[in-house]
């Protein structure tokens, strides 16, 4: 076996320490209110990859990644009687140069993060069909490129039966077209994801939740260069087990735990990063989601979320950061009742980063946050309070 000449090392981390008005730092609805000053975990990803073969236009690249998550509460956090969890996130082979006429097209197989679309300030991937699979991506077709993948994303523990397997095999066909530019400074991407629950004969005999039907999610997005930044609008439609993603800030997981064969939903997202001045910029995410019949007792669910993060650079390395978020969600039930959720978050932070760009990392932040449940849900202080505060220090990095 020949020695591998070079190894690419990439990763991500976030970690810190904080307190709230009642004990350790609180985390509440961060995917709808914003993540700044609203994260209480320790999380990391370590990725190693290498081009193990290269000749002319032909390249074989191996990639791997493991992840770790814990609550950061102790010195030595292990998987034995502690809360640390380790995961295998990526392990795949990517081959270039074997498709005639398109040396940049990729044939791949294995386990991987697959073309995930991220809303960073709310820590959400709104288009995320990742897992074990295979496919061809970035094959040039007209003004853009097409990608086709088969990816597995099973549903586990569908119910509590003990007389058979409660894990259901689900396969996705993911088809995307990206790169078409309808006018100067714009770019687009379109895709269809088709999810197919693949039950066994024994599971078919159970009926009920195991009678789930194939579902579809359609995504279209257009982005535009704007004032030195960008703006993006996303439209999505989903049905069956994929419909709940439209109101849960999900990216494409299939719900097998509810009766969803009549479910439909749609979502509109607008996001952007705009430099207002040379030193001040704003990143925002607006989400409106609607879904019907996502459980056997739910009629309609509506969700609205708006988060904005502003950043002012004092120097190349020191910045003031503010983040404001709010959301409203209403679940209307078939019996005529409803359940409302709503809240706000306000955060101010001093950031120390390795450059003046909005997304410059690594970054250390000293933050203070106020969180409020405006629908009297009492999620804080052992379910006795509608609001609380956080104070702490967090670091975040990717490389």
Question: How does the language model describe each region?
Answer:
Residues 1-102, 137-139, 273, 309-312, ...:
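Beta-barrel outer-membrane channel/assembly domains of diderm bacteria
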Residues 1-9, 49-62, 98-106, 140-147, ...:
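Short loop/turn motifs that connect adjacent beta-strands in outer-membrane beta-barrel proteins
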Residues 2-4, 37-43, 83-90, 125-129, ...:
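Transmembrane beta-barrel outer-membrane domains
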Residues 16-36, 76-84, 89, 101-208, ...:
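Surface-exposed coil loops of outer-membrane beta-barrel proteins
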Residues 50-59, 66, 118-121, 156-172, ...:
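A broadly tuned preference for mixed-charge, low-complexity surface segments
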Residues 175, 180-333, 342-346, 352, ...:
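Detector for outer-membrane/organellar transmembrane beta-barrel domains
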Residues 278-280, 336-338, 356-357, 380-384:
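Short proline/glycine-enriched turn/loop segments at secondary-structure junctions
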């Amino acid at each position: 076996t020949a020695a591998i000449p070079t190894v690419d090392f990439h990763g991500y981390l976030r970690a810190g320490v904080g307190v709230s008005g009642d004990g350790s730092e609180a985390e509440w609805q961060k995917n709808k209110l914003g993540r700044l000053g609203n994260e209480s975990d320790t999380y990391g990803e370590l990725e190693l990859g290498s081009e193990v073969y290269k000749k002319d236009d032909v390249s074989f690249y191996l990639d791997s990644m493991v992840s770790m998550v814990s609550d950061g509460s102790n010195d030595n956090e292990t998987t034995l009687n502690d809360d640390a969890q380790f995961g295998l996130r990526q392990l795949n082979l990517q081959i270039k140069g074997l498709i005639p006429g398109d040396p940049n097209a990729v044939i791949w197989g294995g386990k991987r993060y697959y073309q995930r679309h991220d809303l960073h300030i709310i820590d959400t991937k709104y288009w995320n069909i990742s897992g074990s699979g295979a496919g061809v991506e970035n094959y040039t077709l007209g003004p853009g490129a097409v990608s086709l993948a088969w990816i597995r994303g099973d549903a586990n523990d569908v119910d509590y039966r003990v007389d058979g397997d409660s894990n259901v095999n689900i396969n996705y066909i993911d088809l995307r077209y990206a790169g078409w530019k309808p006018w100067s400074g714009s770019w687009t991407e379109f895709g269809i994801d088709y999810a197919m629950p693949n039950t066994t004969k024994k599971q078919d005999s159970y009926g009920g939740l195991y009678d789930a039907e194939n579902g579809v999610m359609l995504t279209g997005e257009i982005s535009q260069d704007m004032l030195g930044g960008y703006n993006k609008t996303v439209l999505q439609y989903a049905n069956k087990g994929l419909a709940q993603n439209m109101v849960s800030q999900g990216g494409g997981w299939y719900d097998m735990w509810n009766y969803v064969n009549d479910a439909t939903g749609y979502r509109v997202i607008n996001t952007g990063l705009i430099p207002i001045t040379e030193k001040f910029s704003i990143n925002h995410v607006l989400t409106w989601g609607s879904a019907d019949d996502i459980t056997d007792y739910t009629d309609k669910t509506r969700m609205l979320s708006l988060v904005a993060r502003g950043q002012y650079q004092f120097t190349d390395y020191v910045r003031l950061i503010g983040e404001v978020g709010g959301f409203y969600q209403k679940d209307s039930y078939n019996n005529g009742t409803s359940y409302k959720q709503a809240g706000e978050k306000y955060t101010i932070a001093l950031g120390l980063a390795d450059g003046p760009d909005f997304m410059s990392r690594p970054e250390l932040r000293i933050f203070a946050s106020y969180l409020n449940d405006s629908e009297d849900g009492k999620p804080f202080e052992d379910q006795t309070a509608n609001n609380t505060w956080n104070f702490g220090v967090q670091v975040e990095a990717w490389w």
